[in-house]
């Protein structure tokens, strides 16, 4: 029994000592999507693996020269894993995650507005370049798919429903030009 406790303590302490490497990142390209705020955190759990969690938030409604406001509002939460063939926070990576998004988008190309919830999983890949011991730049892209519950309205403010329901989707995701700080 004592040996098992000693072994468990050694594994926990050894893992905790390595897991103190973490990074915090923000995707610059998301700010071009109507000012979507975003943050992502990674924790190294092994030499080639990181746990990733991120969120995006856009509460903004824009008034343009058109009678209808522009909206690209969203709340997104994601959690997943990344595999780094060489070493964490440096070089190529492959990722997988589960994701939830609540969205409201409309008035951009037409007055039609759609809102709803999306649940799904995604795959992504990219490359991280070390600028400095603590500063990285990442580029990448991916796709995600799953189930979407939605409602389509005639205009952003009128509330006239055109369509609603559930459907599956596949969308581009994680178009990334991120700046990250590694602790």
Language-model segments: residues:
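Sec/Tat signal peptide C-region and signal peptidase I cleavage site
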Residues: 13-21
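Extracytoplasmic loops and strand-loop junctions of Gram-negative outer membrane beta-barrel proteins
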Residues: 21-24, 61-64, 106-110, 158-163
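Solvent-exposed loop/turn segments connecting transmembrane beta-strands
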Residues: 23-40, 58, 66, 88
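Predominantly the C-terminal beta-signal and adjacent terminal strand-loop region
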Residues: 132-183
């Amino acid at each position: 029994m004592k040996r098992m406790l000693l072994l468990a303590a050694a594994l926990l302490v050894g893992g905790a000592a390595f897991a103190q490497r973490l990074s915090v990142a923000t995707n610059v390209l998301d700010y071009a999507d109507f000012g979507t705020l975003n943050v992502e955190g990674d924790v190294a759990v092994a030499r080639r693996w990181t746990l990733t969690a991120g969120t995006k938030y856009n509460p903004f409604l824009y008034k343009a020269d058109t009678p209808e406001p522009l909206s690209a509002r969203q709340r997104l939460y994601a959690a997943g894993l990344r595999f780094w063939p060489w070493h964490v926070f440096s070089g190529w990576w492959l990722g997988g995650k589960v994701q939830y998004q609540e969205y409201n988008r409309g008035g951009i190309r037409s007055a039609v507005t759609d809102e709803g919830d999306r649940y799904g999983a995604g795959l992504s890949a990219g490359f991280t370049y070390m600028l400095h011991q603590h500063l990285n730049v990442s580029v990448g892209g991916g796709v995600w798919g799953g189930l979407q519950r939605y409602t389509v309205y005639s205009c952003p403010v009128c509330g006239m429903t055109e369509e609603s329901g559930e459907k599956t989707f596949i969308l581009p995701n994680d178009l990334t030009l991120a700046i990250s700080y590694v602790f």
